[in-house]
């Protein structure tokens, strides 16, 4: 019968929604990734900004090794808390240098070793300050243990030194070369003005003792270039340079002066600064300069 056959199949339309959904998910994931990357970059930048440089970390490590590990530093710090003035005395050279396997005697001349003379004078200065009662002196080295200049500076800094005096003797192959010079913190350092004031006191005192003053007044700035070559500027040259000076002077955290008392290779200089009597006279000169520097009598 007409019209009784199987009705025609209804057309079915299928809407494919899966592909747009996947696209939206992908875009969302990319956006989230970009956001996370941005946040990570900001955090990394901030961390790098607060992270110490290799040099800063090395200095911090030196201070950590010096601070709190030695009874002397603890004792000096305690005395400083009681109002005493901390003065660091640095005897140049001394001790066996493990890098070369031999003792760091410093310069040799006139039958003397620089390390012996500087330790003798430094110890005499220490004793005078200790007897005074207003000071808490410390030696950055004892002559038996080798300590790098950075470690010596770290010891002084850890003890809260308010002044550092580093004692040395000069050397020249020509025995006719002579004279006194001292080297304060350089103009680019915040400790320059006070270091220069102390250096001028010391130079004037040694000049009065009969020492020839090198340069214009016995006070000179010493710098080291990128190749570690030393060069000199006189004390009236206030040019701010980026090159470093002596490590013990630059890193101790207080006004500091490195003294080259005279030439160990010159007989006249040795007579004035390196004999037993001369070491006592030099120590007294330093003591008097320290009193003047701190306005004490």
Q: What annotation goes with each model-predicted range?
A:
Residues 1-24:
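N-terminal Lys/Arg-rich, disordered targeting/topogenic segments
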Residues 5-11, 27-83, 91:
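Boundary/activation segment at the start of structured domains
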Residues 5-7, 20, 40-42, 51, ...:
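Compositionally biased, intrinsically disordered low-complexity regions
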Residues 10-11, 23, 55, 94, ...:
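A generic alpha-helix propensity feature with a strong bias for hydrophobic helices
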Residues 18-28, 41-60, 76-77, 116-297:
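Active-site-proximal helix/loop segments of hydrolytic enzymes
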Residues 78, 84-111:
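Short glycine-rich His-centered loop
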Residues 82-96, 178, 253-261:
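Short coil-to-beta-strand
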């Amino acid at each position: 019968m007409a019209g009784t056959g199987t009705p025609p199949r209804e057309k079915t339309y299928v809407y494919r929604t899966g592909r747009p959904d996947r696209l939206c998910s992908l875009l969302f994931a990319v956006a989230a990734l970009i956001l996370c990357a941005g946040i990570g970059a900001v955090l990394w930048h901030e961390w790098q900004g607060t992270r110490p440089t290799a040099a800063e970390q090395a200095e911090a490590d030196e201070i950590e090794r010096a601070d709190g590990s030695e009874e002397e530093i603890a004792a000096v710090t305690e005395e400083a808390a009681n109002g005493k003035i901390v003065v660091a005395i640095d005897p140049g050279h001394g001790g066996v240098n493990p890098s070369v396997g031999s003792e760091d005697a410093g310069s040799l001349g006139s039958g003397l070793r620089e390390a012996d003379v500087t330790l003798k004078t430094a110890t005499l200065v220490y004793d005078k300050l200790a007897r005074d009662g207003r000071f808490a002196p410390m030696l950055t080295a004892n002559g038996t243990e080798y300590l790098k200049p950075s470690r010596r500076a770290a010891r002084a800094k850890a003890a809260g030194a308010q002044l550092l005096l580093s004692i040395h003797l000069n050397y020249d192959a020509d025995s006719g070369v002579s004279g006194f010079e001292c080297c304060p913190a350089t103009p680019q350092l915040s400790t320059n003005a006070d270091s220069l004031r102390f250096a001028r006191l010391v130079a004037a005192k040694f000049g009065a003792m009969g020492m020839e003053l090198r340069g214009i007044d016995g006070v000179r700035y010493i710098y080291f270039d990128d190749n570690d070559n030393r060069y000199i500027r006189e004390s009236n040259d206030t040019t701010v340079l980026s090159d470093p000076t002596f490590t013990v002077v630059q890193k101790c955290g207080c006004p500091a002066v490195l003294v080259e008392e005279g030439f160990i290779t010159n007989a006249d200089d040795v007579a004035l600064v390196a004999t037993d009597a001369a070491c006592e006279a030099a120590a007294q000169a330093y003591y008097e300069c320290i009193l003047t520097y701190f306005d004490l009598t």
